[in-house]
Each structure stands twice: as structure tokens, then as C-alpha cells.
């Protein structure tokens, strides 16, 4: 099977019309469920944070909407990897509320999006931290 055929099977989802981009992690993790991937730990691209139009520095609503769905995907599909990388999953629990608030979602809507009671409880407990980070990012 050719790479292009595999890529055609996994389309980039658009959960919200305000999304400017779909985080590629979502597609790559879905692909990894079916196919084995090899990773080469070598830098192939350099991102500069000091550019005026840098996507990595700007915090806007459309980016927050995309990040919200990325964090939500991590919580609902990758929580079983908490043993291997607990910091990664903790960031997702905080990030889902932070970017949820930045994109205009209510707390009840954020909690409703989690697929289990335990995940909802963790998100609820870390929601104040996400709210504080939301207020810091607005400035």
C-alpha cells in the first residue's frame, strides 16, 4: 500500500467551522491504531517563534477551538497511556478547560464532552487551573 492511499483513508476532521486547522496529532494517532509507524528522532524543520505571523505564538479563538478538540481527543482516546507519559495526559486535562474557555465553551459543555465519569471528575478538579490559564492567555 502506498503512503498516499493511507493518507486518503484518514481525512482531517473539522469539528467546528471556526477551526483554522485540525491538529495533525489526531490524524496520526488514528493512523497509528492500524499501521505501525517508524519515528526518526531528527529535526527536519525549524520553527521560529519571533516571526510576526507565527502560528505558535498567536493565541486566538480559532486556534483555541482546534486545540480544544485536540485535548479532547487525547482525553477520550489516549488516557490509557497515562502510565507512560503522565505529564502529557495532565496537560490534556488542563488544556481542555483552558482552550474550551478561550473558545467560548461553558463548563458544562466541556464536562459533557468527556466520555467517562472519572475523566469528567479530573477535568472538573483541574478546571480552576484551566480558567486561570485562560485569563492569563487573554491578556
Model regions and ranges:
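Catalytic core of nucleotide-sugar-dependent glycosyltransferases
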Residues: 43-50, 57-83, 107-113
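Conserved nucleotide-sugar donor-binding catalytic segment
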Residues: 1-58
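Acidic/histidine metal-binding catalytic segments
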Residues: 21, 86-89
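Structural register within alpha-helical repeat arrays
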Residues: 89-96
Amino acid at each position: 500500500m502506498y503512503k498516499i492511499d493511507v493518507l486518503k483513508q484518514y481525512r482531517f476532521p473539522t469539528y467546528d467551522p471556526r477551526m483554522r486547522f485540525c491538529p495533525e496529532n489526531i490524524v496520526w494517532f488514528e493512523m497509528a491504531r492500524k499501521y505501525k509507524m517508524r519515528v526518526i528522532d531528527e529535526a527536519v524543520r525549524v520553527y521560529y517563534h519571533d516571526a510576526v505571523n507565527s502560528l505558535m505564538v498567536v493565541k486566538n479563538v480559532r486556534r483555541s477551538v482546534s486545540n480544544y478538540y485536540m485535548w479532547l481527543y487525547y482525553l477520550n482516546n489516549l488516557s490509557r497511556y497515562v502510565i507512560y507519559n503522565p505529564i502529557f495526559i495532565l496537560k490534556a486535562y488542563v488544556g481542555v478547560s483552558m482552550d474550551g474557555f478561550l473558545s467560548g465553551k461553558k463548563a458544562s459543555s466541556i464536562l459533557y464532552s468527556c466520555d467517562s465519569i472519572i475523566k469528567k471528575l479530573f477535568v472538573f478538579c483541574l478546571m480552576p487551573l484551566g480558567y486561570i490559564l485562560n485569563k492569563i492567555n487573554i491578556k
